[in-house]
């Protein structure tokens, strides 16, 4: 599919849905704020990955070349605090949870990014950016830290709508700040924390600086689309815009933000104790069913989790799967065809997935009628269109990845029951300070090809070189 009819996307900065026109014809550059790898992923984290994976797949289906960058924040206050509380090196804590996020994305067949830069790998670029800001009069040093001077950038607040007098960065009071509305670009060295040398002394980067530097490194001073969760609009994305444009970069031309997964009307978060971890969810539903559910709402809408909604999504997915299996059994091989015009119109209208799904189920109903009437050609046309459309949404039931994973998921579920029993025995041994027995259980599991990692969320197991549970 190469017809590039008008694609319209909601730009947070403009506050409206507007025509998407890339910087370079035929090419799209996208930066997605990825995970801060402080803990295990839950379905709220992964929804963002699914939402913008659909955007990427749709652009690819329309014939664009897509450069898709998703970063990893592997140095940040919460990572340091949680690693210290667990008595583990910060870098090991970050790497462990980065692997868990990668496994979660892979489980839902989120396409790998074109590049996945880590913040710690781009310290040089961050220092260079600070130097440009200081030279331009937009940043200053104070108390070992470096701050961005918010009042030096008159356009501050254009993305979020915040008025300058109402700005609160949430960083607390700092002696080196000239104005409490300013935000930190570089944090001076503290005992026990990692640090890097700079012209202003040793220290580590501020969160906002990291993304600006990495986006520029991979996509250049100006690129097409910046994505992320709606909770990042302020202060994170507002500060990214300010520092990047103050440094002379055009930065992102479109800003897309996805809604949260909520429970009881509250954003899913560990602090509220209402999270549903990816390993737990994948014990209850198949990966393709979970992906279907997370992608089923409009990306800008809140997705209120409930068991009823989850089961409705499973039922809808199984209905499509059953239809495709019936056609394959009675008619023959089903190859992906082309999406219908109504499906394309829906996705061209700011990725209106609910309307696109309604079209898919309409085509399924037509296909079932054709199959029941003995119209094999009509049934095959419907099935081919459904495969194409579900493929763009990332959950084509006949894709070999999903069919093989169904068998793998069932096997992992059976193994998990056995491993969890062993882990419970190990936890009891540790509570009784029977370290020899605890080590024996861990060694027994390792000899069976199962690695155990102790985290703040409890012990997690993974197949050596494979899936995490």
Curated annotation (Swiss-Prot):
Cofactor note: Binds 1 zinc ion per subunit.
EC number(s) stated in the UniProt entry for this protein: 6.1.1.16
Chain residues that bind Zn(2+): 33, 211, 236, 240
Pfam families xrefs: DALR_2, tRNA-synt_1e
Cofactor(s) this protein requires: Zn(2+)
Biological process annotations from GO: cysteinyl-tRNA aminoacylation
Motif ('KMSKS' region): 267-271
Binding-site residues, ATP: 270
Catalytic activity, as annotated: tRNA(Cys) + L-cysteine + ATP = L-cysteinyl-tRNA(Cys) + AMP + diphosphate
Motif 'HIGH' region per UniProt: ranges: 35-45
SUPFAM superfamilies: Anticodon-binding domain of a subclass of class I aminoacyl-tRNA synthetases, Nucleotidylyl transferase
Any single GO CC term annotated in Swiss-Prot or TrEMBL for this entry: cytoplasm
InterPro entries in UniProt: Cys-tRNA-ligase, Cys-tRNA-synt_Ia_DALR, Cys-tRNA/MSH_ligase, Rossmann-like_a/b/a_fold, tRNA-synt_1_cat_dom, tRNAsynth_Ia_anticodon-bd
Top-rank lineage group of the source organism: Bacteria
Cellular compartment(s): Cytoplasm
Gene Ontology MF terms: ATP binding; cysteine-tRNA ligase activity; zinc ion binding
Stored SMART domains: DALR_2
UniProt keyword annotations, A-Z: Aminoacyl-tRNA synthetase, ATP-binding, Cytoplasm, Ligase, Metal-binding, Nucleotide-binding, Protein biosynthesis, Zinc
NCBIfam families: cysS
Assembly and interaction partners: Monomer.
Family under the similarity heading: Belongs to the class-I aminoacyl-tRNA synthetase family.
Protein name (Swiss-Prot/TrEMBL): Cysteine--tRNA ligase
Organism from which the protein derives: Mycobacterium tuberculosis (strain ATCC 25618 / H37Rv)
């Amino acid at each position: 599919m190469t017809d590039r009819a008008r694609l319209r996307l909601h730009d947070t900065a403009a506050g409206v849905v507007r025509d998407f026109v890339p910087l370079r014809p035929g090419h799209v550059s996208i930066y997605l704020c990825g995970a801060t790898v402080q803990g295990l992923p839950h379905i709220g984290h992964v929804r963002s990955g699914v939402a913008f994976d659909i955007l990427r797949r749709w652009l690819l289906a329309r014939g664009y070349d897509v450069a898709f960058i998703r970063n990893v924040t592997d140095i940040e206050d919460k990572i340091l605090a949680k690693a210290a509380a667990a008595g583990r090196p910060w870098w090991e804590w970050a790497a462990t949870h980065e692997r868990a996020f990668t496994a979660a994305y892979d489980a839902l067949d989120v396409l790998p990014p074109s590049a996945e830069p880590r913040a710690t790998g781009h310290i040089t670029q961050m220092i260079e950016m600070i130097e440009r800001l200081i030279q331009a009069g937009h940043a200053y040093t104070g108390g070992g830290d470096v701050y961005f001077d918010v009042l030096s950038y008159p356009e501050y607040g254009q993305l979020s709508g915040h008025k300058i007098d109402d700005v609160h960065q949430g960083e607390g009071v700092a002696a080196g700040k000239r104005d409490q509305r300013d935000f930190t670009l570089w944090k001076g060295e503290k005992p026990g924390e990692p640090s890097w040398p700079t012209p202003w002394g040793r220290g580590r980067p501020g969160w906002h600086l990291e993304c600006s530097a990495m986006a520029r490194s991979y996509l250049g001073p100006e690129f097409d689309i910046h994505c992320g969760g709606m909770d990042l609009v302020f202060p994170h994305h507002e500060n990214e815009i300010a520092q990047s444009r103050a440094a002379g970069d055009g930065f992102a031309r479109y800003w897309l933000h996805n809604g949260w997964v909520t429970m009881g009307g509250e954003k899913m978060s560990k602090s509220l104790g209402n999270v549903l971890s990816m390993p737990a969810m994948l014990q209850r539903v198949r990966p393709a069913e979970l992906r279907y559910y997370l992608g089923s709402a409009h990306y800008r809408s809140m997705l209120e989790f409930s068991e009823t909604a989850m089961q409705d999504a499973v039922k809808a997915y199984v209905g499509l799967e059953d239809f495709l299996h019936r056609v394959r059994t009675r008619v023959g091989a089903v190859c992906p065809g082309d999406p219908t015009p109504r499906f394309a119109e829906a996705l061209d209208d700011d990725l209106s997935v609910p309307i696109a799904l309604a079209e898919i189920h309409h085509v399924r109903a037509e296909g079932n009628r054709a199959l029941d009437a003995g119209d094999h050609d009509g049934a095959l046309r419907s099935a081919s269109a459904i495969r194409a459309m579900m493929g763009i949404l990332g959950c084509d039931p006949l894709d070999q990845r999903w069919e093989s994973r169904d068998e793998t998921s069932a096997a992992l579920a059976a193994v998990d029951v056995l491993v969890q029993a062993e882990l419970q025995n190990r936890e009891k041994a540790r509570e009784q300070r029977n370290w020899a027995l605890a080590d024996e259980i861990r060694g027994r599991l390792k000899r069976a090809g199962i690695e155990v990692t102790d985290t703040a969320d409890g012990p997690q197991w993974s197949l050596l070189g494979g899936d995490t549970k």
